[in-house]
From Swiss-Prot:
One of its GO terms (molecular function) is hexose transmembrane transporter activity. Disulfide bonds join 60-67. The chain crosses the membrane at residues 26-46, 76-96, 102-122, 132-152, 167-187, 204-224, 290-310, 328-348, 357-377, 391-411, 426-446, 452-472. PROSITE patterns: MFS, PROKAR_LIPOPROTEIN, SUGAR_TRANSPORT_1, SUGAR_TRANSPORT_2. This is Hexose transporter 1. One of its GO terms (cellular component) is plasma membrane. It comes from Plasmodium knowlesi. Residues 47-75, 123-131, 188-203, 311-327, 378-390, 447-451 are extracellular. Alpha-D-glucose binds at residues 166, 301-302, 307, 408.
Length: 500
């Protein structure tokens, strides 16, 4: 039982500046979430301006905008972001070791340079290189921002603030598509020159992240100058850690959260001593099994088709809509994606991880399979076209409340502590690699027939449903550092010591 002093201390922490959603901790989190916004923006920015770049750079001189040359180059540009992210995510672990706030400052400075480079490009090779760099920055964000948020947040608000990362990603996607509406319709004839506004605007859209990055630097340099309390404590700066905790909790009495950080640091050190390398884990059947499950689950997420809709919806909608409605519908889709992230905060704890994953996959199958069959029968019917458009929205809703957020929660709950970091990183790497596999040929397949994509995504979602149903276990309510796939006795046998 807690004594009266401990109860008073806990009550003090709850009744001070940490109360409510809007508090000091939130301000630090929002400064980091500007990087999350950059993530979403950079993934989606090409969606609405790709065809205008084709015309200005003359990739299809005398031909249609979707000529073979432009289709191939567009495929490289779309996939290059994900290729860069693979490299960046691998480098991010090294960067955060030098400080969480420091890593955010590096990211913001990096995107200033990338934005300038992209906005002044005049050749395919330079824009391809700049998109690779954008992807590298996105890879850095995937680790740096969630870690900063987790360590700079009141313990009772980690879940609510943690979802802000995903919300700002979807908000960045929305803004990128919204700004693209100003470009208007793509000229009917590829030989028609772009208007002066269009020539300037698509470059300004590439430059826009520079403004957001400068804002992030200003906030972290002049207003939120402290490192996270966990990082400070880890580096032996206990008093500095205590001071920032006072700001986060709105109380001078922070002995309880300081002790929690101390325990976490000690547990982390113990985990490092007891950790099993990924190579060694792959040689042990029980560990290899859970690692493969995580990698397959992660890879299948991309084969639902989410990143084709996020990064290439305009190309997909061309077959179903007139030009003036294409970007408008993409904007509406991104709004739905943004708004439907909110319900996941509540239902993930109510329904559980496995149930949500199954429901999401079932929703995607119900959206895409009938649509694929209908398009196969008569793809010129107005009813079928409306069905195809509706299917993309059902898919977005199904994904946003399930596979989208739940995967990343599950990957940090399914692995035991001794392999969690390396196994989760490998699963994330598989996710990025599968994104490349899916996104790269999407332009080519859409040009051939969107029906093919509908069949692929519905078929893979059926595979994902069956895989989850038969192999994936529920992790809701599980203890931190444990795994439903490996018993304590099995873990102790391979670690050679007690595991708690």
């Amino acid at each position: 039982m807690k004594n009266s002093n401990e109860i008073s201390s806990s009550q003090s922490l709850k009744n001070n500046g940490s109360d409510g959603f809007f508090n000091t901790s939130l301000m630090y989190v929002l400064a980091a979430c500007l990087a999350s916004f950059l993530f979403g923006y950079q993934v989606s920015v090409l969606n609405t301006i790709k065809d205008f770049i084709v015309i200005e750079f003359g990739w299809c001189a005398g031909k249609e905008v979707n000529c073979d040359d432009s289709t191939l180059k567009s495929s490289f540009l779309l996939a290059s972001v994900f290729i860069g992210a693979v490299v960046g995510s691998g480098f991010s672990g090294f960067l955060v070791q030098h400080g969480r706030r420091f890593s955010l400052l590096v990211i913001y400075n990096f995107f200033i340079l990338v934005s300038i480079l992209t906005s002044i490009t005049h050749h395919f090779h330079t824009i391809l290189f700049s998109r690779l760099l954008s992807g590298f920055g996105i890879g850095l964000i995937t680790v740096s921002v969630p870690m900063y948020i987790s360590e700079m947040t009141h313990k009772d608000k980690k879940g609510a603030y943690g979802v802000l990362h995903q919300l700002f990603i979807t908000f960045g996607i929305f803004i990128a598509v919204l700004l693209g509406m100003a470009m208007g319709n793509v000229p009917e004839e590829v030989n028609n020159p772009l208007g002066t506004f269009q020539q300037i605007w698509w470059r300004l859209m590439f430059f826009f992240p520079c403004i957001i990055s400068i804002l992030g630097i200003v906030l972290l340099t002049f207003f939120f100058k402290e490192e996270t309390p966990y990082y400070l404590f880890e580096k032996g700066k206990v008093e500095e850690s205590k001071e920032i905790l006072k700001k986060i909790y709105g109380s001078d009495d922070v002995d309880e959260p300081l002790k929690a950080i101390k325990d976490a640091v000690e547990q982390n050190e113990a985990a490092k001593k007891n950790s099993i390398s990924l190579m060694r884990a792959m040689k042990i059947p029980s560990y290899r099994y859970v690692i493969l499950l995580g990698c397959i689950l992660s890879g299948l997420q991309q084969f639902t088709g989410i990143n084709v809709l996020v990064s290439n919806s305009n190309a997909l909608y061309k077959g179903f809509l007139t030009n003036e409605w294409i970007t408008t519908l993409s904007v509406i889709m991104t709004v739905v994606n943004f708004l439907m992230t909110f319900p996941a905060i509540y239902i993930v704890e109510k329904l559980g991880r496995k149930t949500l994953l199954l429901c999401g996959c079932a929703g995607i199958v119900c959206a895409f399979l009938p649509t694929a069959i209908a398009n196969l029968i008569n793809n010129t019917s107005d009813v079928v076209k409306k069905l195809s458009i509706s299917a993309t929205f059902v898919m977005i809703v199904s994904f946003a409340v399930s596979y989208g957020p739940v995967l990343w929660i599950y990957l940090h709950e399914m692995f035991p502590s001794e392999i969690k970091d390396s196994a989760a990183s490998l699963a994330s790497l598989v996710n990025w690699m599968c994104a490349i596999i899916v996104v790269f040929p999407s332009d080519i397949i859409i040009k051939q027939s969107p029906t093919i994509l509908f069949f692929i995504f519905s078929g893979m979602s059926i595979v994902a449903f069956l895989f989850i149903f038969f192999f994936i276990k529920e992790t809701k309510g599980g203890e931190i550092g444990t795994s439903p796939y490996i018993t304590l006795e099995e873990r102790q046998k391979h670690m050679g010591k007690s595991v708690v």
